[in-house]
């Protein structure tokens, strides 16, 4: 594992930095894997030029598994982001132990514990993607030592069942200091969405649109190579 591998890869990217998500299930759209081998999707993402790979380990709502995260980290040289509803330091330790590069920390869940969890994750060599959805959450996030701040265009409190779009990124990203890598998450389905997001953010995290596509690699390649 390269220390802070994801934020470094985004900073150094020559093309559009897309964190491509292997998303098994969506509360809104149901089964996204549709019988496909997730490792074949991983290979497709690698070949199409993803800057990193995201995977949701939450089992209850997104049908992910920690065991597959372990497999993923062994199978790819790309930085891997673990997404989950992290509430304990033990989960951070486990994330680092299996070789992930980054961990999602949700401001709404951690609240006052956020700075402490960010520092703990960084001590373990992990990039921290601190997720925000409101201006008040952003005020908390920018007080931390996080390497990255993610703007979730959808409301995780509603399990992404809402129709959020990149307009939230356009509002919040300009308020984030340059020392943070800014990531626009969720609600990016078209080239126009991506262009709007990357005009104000450093990277985009895309899952549902890629997983719903008949040819995820083809769509990702289009996103990675698009003129912004």
From Swiss-Prot:
Its EC number is 4.1.1.48. It catalyses: 1-(2-carboxyphenylamino)-1-deoxy-D-ribulose 5-phosphate + H(+) = (1S,2R)-1-C-(indol-3-yl)glycerol 3-phosphate + CO2 + H2O. This is Indole-3-glycerol phosphate synthase. Belongs to the TrpC family. One of its GO terms (molecular function) is phosphoribosylanthranilate isomerase activity. It comes from the Archaea. Gene3D superfamilies: Aldolase class I (3.20.20.70). Pathway: Amino-acid biosynthesis; L-tryptophan biosynthesis; L-tryptophan from chorismate: step 4/5. Pfam families: IGPS. Keywords: Amino-acid biosynthesis, Aromatic amino acid biosynthesis, Decarboxylase, Lyase, Tryptophan biosynthesis. PROSITE patterns: IGPS.
């Amino acid at each position: 594992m390269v220390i802070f591998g994801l934020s470094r890869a985004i900073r150094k990217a020559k093309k559009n930095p897309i964190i491509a998500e292997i998303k098994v299930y969506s509360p809104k759209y149901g089964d996204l894997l549709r019988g496909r081998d997730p490792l074949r999707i991983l290979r497709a993402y690698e070949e199409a030029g993803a800057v990193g790979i995201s995977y949701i380990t939450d089992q209850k709502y997104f049908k992910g598994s920690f065991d597959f995260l372990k497999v993923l980290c062994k199978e790819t040289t790309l930085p891997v982001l673990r997404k989950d509803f992290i509430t304990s330091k033990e989960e951070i330790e486990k994330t680092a132990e299996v070789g992930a590069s980054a961990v999602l920390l949700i401001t709404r869940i951690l609240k006052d514990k956020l700075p402490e969890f960010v520092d703990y994750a960084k001590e373990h060599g992990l990039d921290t993607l601190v997720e925000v959805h409101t201006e008040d959450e952003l005020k908390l996030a920018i007080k931390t030592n996080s390497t990255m701040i993610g703007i979730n265009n959808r409301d995780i409190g509603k399990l992404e069942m809402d129709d959020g779009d990149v307009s939230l990124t356009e509002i919040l990203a300009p308020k984030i200091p340059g020392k943070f890598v800014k990531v626009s998450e969720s609600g990016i389905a078209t080239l126009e969405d991506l262009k709007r997001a990357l005009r104000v953010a450093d990277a985009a995290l895309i899952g549902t649109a890629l997983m719903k596509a008949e040819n995820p690699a083809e769509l990702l390649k289009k996103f990675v190579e698009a003129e912004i």
